[in-house]
């Protein structure tokens, strides 16, 4: 499955998420079930999946392409954070892969 989600804050797009889910783990995945809720809670509760500590994410920055700018309601060339995540189960099997395009002017990351 390749679900896409657009997360809004006060009806303004903040994050455009593209996810790959293996169908063998999520045979009846319902994108509507996560429309207004947590993706992680849904897969944990519905499929009893656990994310391994070895999972990893990287953050990079790019300039918004015309298509990305349209989706996130930005100007072309505005800064966009890219969060790439590779999540796996404790036994090392791929759980999901995602790429999130985050409007740089509308989001803060804290560590």
Describe the role of every protein-language-model region.
Residues 1-111:
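C-terminal all-alpha effector/ligand-binding and dimerization domain
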